[in-house]
Design a protein with these regions (language model features):
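Outer-membrane beta-barrel biogenesis signature
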Residues: 22-61, 261-265
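Gram-negative (and chloroplast) outer-membrane scaffold detector with strong preference
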Residues: 81, 86-87, 92-179
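Sec-dependent bacterial lipoprotein signal peptides
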Residues: 1-22
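Outer-envelope beta-barrel architecture signal
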Residues: 26-27, 54-62, 73, 85-87, ...
């Protein structure tokens, strides 16, 4: 009886092993990370146009906006000041991330500052052009590790705008060109994340890229406070295959005032 029981037990174990080997269900941890997961990690994020459209000496502006686009959402603060009739200063800081509510795939922050020329072309028409430099960092959280992208850039940003007499309604067109230098450091598994590896290799081979970011700016409200919104696209003129955020939509508020002291006659 014991011998028969052993034989029956062996047959059952063998059948279970055979059936298990024939199971074609999903694999919980595939060797190769799906490309869709790898594409949650991005290597460049554009900021919204820092085009506050100030026009008078000693004008000061502050913007606070929520921004978002393909593969990111964030917050931006911008400031500008006209210390002279035709001279302007700008600065901007942006930060954000790409997540799905339970997993964070990317975080970034970026700072830019510049100086520019400002003039009124005719009644209601405004022109400005700013140039400056910036720096930033992108941290990607891959399925098998991490990557860090350090960015430095210089830019030029001309803009035309039209406004009503009180400058409580303004519409502008901006065209920003940036030269961006990428420096990448990685710790993820190159063999398992082939798409991400190809992106990193392309940045090592060509670390300097020219970006073109045309956009529209619209703001309306009162003399000292305006609702502000903008939309811009981002095109990589050096390597269109670089996986990046390709647009930026922002909405928020803008404070405006003039720092000139009033003289009582």
């Amino acid at each position: 009886m014991k011998k028969n029981s052993l034989i029956k037990g062996s047959i059952i174990v063998a059948c279970m092993g055979f059936l298990h080997s024939c199971y074609f269900g999903p694999i919980s941890d595939p060797y190769y990370v799906p490309e869709s997961r790898q594409q949650e990690n991005v290597y460049y994020v554009p900021s919204s146009p820092n085009t506050q459209l100030l026009s008078e000496k000693n004008d000061i502006g502050f913007d606070l906006v929520a921004s978002g686009g393909s593969k990111f959402s964030g917050v931006e603060t911008q400031a500008s000041f006209l210390p002279a009739k035709h001279v302007g200063l700008i600065a901007g800081y942006s930060s954000g991330k790409n997540d799905d509510g339970s997993n964070t795939y990317m975080k970034f922050h970026k700072f830019e500052g510049g100086v520019g020329y400002v003039t009124n072309l005719s009644k209601g028409w405004h022109f400005e052009t700013y140039g400056g430099v910036g720096t930033g960092k992108i941290d990607n959280f891959h399925a098998t590790g991490n990557s860090k992208v350090d960015l430095t850039n210089f830019f030029i940003q001309p803009a035309f705008a039209v406004s009503n007499k009180r400058k409580t309604v303004q519409f502008g067109i901006v065209s920003k060109f940036s030269g961006v230098n990428f420096k990448v450091d990685t710790t993820f598994d190159n063999a398992r994340e082939l798409y991400s590896t190809s992106q990193v290799i392309s940045l090592h081979d060509q670390p300097f890229h020219i970006m073109w970011e045309p956009g529209l700016v619209f703001q309306f409200g009162w003399k000292s406070f305006l609702f502000h919104t903008s939309y811009s696209l981002s095109a990589d003129l050096t390597n269109s295959q670089l996986h990046r955020a390709t647009d930026n939509f922002s909405i928020g508020g803008a404070l405006r005032f003039n720092a000139s002291k009033k003289v009582i006659q």
